[in-house]
């Protein structure tokens, strides 16, 4: 006669399975986050390619952050759509008073950023102000002393407030391999407040540099952090400056 499992044997098997699951779950979680991080880095590389293609079409100039019609969606994320997989921007006549019709590319969304698609920004990535403001403007911004606070200074570097946009040229780059062009955005995705937000990777972020390479860095590794300003927008000397190492 075949003997079945006893209750004790069954409990032992269940306990072993539970222990194995407890050991494997953190490993699987880390593997999932590593995959998301790699996907995020791939996104930034494609964004870097889009910036280079845009510059090649516009005499070596980088795009503006936005214009006076920013509320209608005319910002850097929109003008790059035509250069990104799955993105598209409808051309409109000058002076057209309606919002642009845009098909957004998923490349602008980090896999770990669950809220980016829900808000007007519709991106997980920031565009360094050094590429759309003159160096003297950036030096003025760098005089902000409380960049780590919750003051609404982020609205300035995002181009929403008064500084005029001055698109910079690729020819002005001095250290392309050391100049951060874009990075994961320190944001809570509030619609307009610009309050302090979170870092996707526990105090670290993926950074795209002007030469096209991507590097995963802790925020204190970016040079403005020495003045308590861990943000690529506030690098002294603008596009001619160096952010890392």
Language model regions located:
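Juxtamembrane interface helices immediately C-terminal to a transmembrane segment
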Residues: 23, 32-43
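N-terminal single-pass transmembrane signal-anchor helix
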Residues: 2-32
């Amino acid at each position: 006669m075949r003997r079945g499992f006893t209750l004790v044997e069954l409990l032992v098997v269940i306990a072993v399975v539970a222990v194995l699951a407890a050991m494997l779950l953190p490993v699987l979680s880390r593997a999932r986050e590593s995959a998301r991080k790699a996907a995020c880095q791939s996104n930034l590389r494609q964004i870097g390619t889009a910036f280079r293609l845009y510059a090649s079409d516009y005499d070596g100039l980088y795009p503006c952050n936005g214009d006076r019609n920013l509320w209608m969606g005319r910002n850097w994320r929109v003008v790059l759509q035509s250069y990104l997989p799955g993105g598209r921007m409808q051309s409109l006549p000058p002076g057209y008073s309606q919002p642009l019709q845009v098909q957004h590319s998923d490349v602008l969304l980090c896999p770990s950023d669950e809220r980016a698609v829900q808000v007007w920004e519709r991106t997980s990535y920031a565009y360094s102000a050094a590429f759309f403001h003159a160096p003297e403007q950036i030096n003025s911004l760098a005089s902000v002393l409380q960049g780590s606070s919750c003051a609404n200074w982020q609205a300035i570097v995002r181009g929403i407030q008064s500084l005029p946009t001055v698109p910079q040229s690729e020819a002005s780059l001095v250290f392309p391999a050391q100049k951060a062009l874009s990075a994961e955005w320190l944001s809570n995705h509030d619609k307009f407040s610009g309050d302090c937000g979170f870092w996707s990777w526990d105090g670290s972020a993926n950074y795209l540099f002007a030469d096209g390479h991507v590097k995963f860095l802790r925020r204190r590794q970016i040079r403005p952090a020495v003045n308590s300003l861990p943000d690529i927008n506030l690098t002294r000397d603008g596009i001619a400056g160096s952010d890392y190492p």
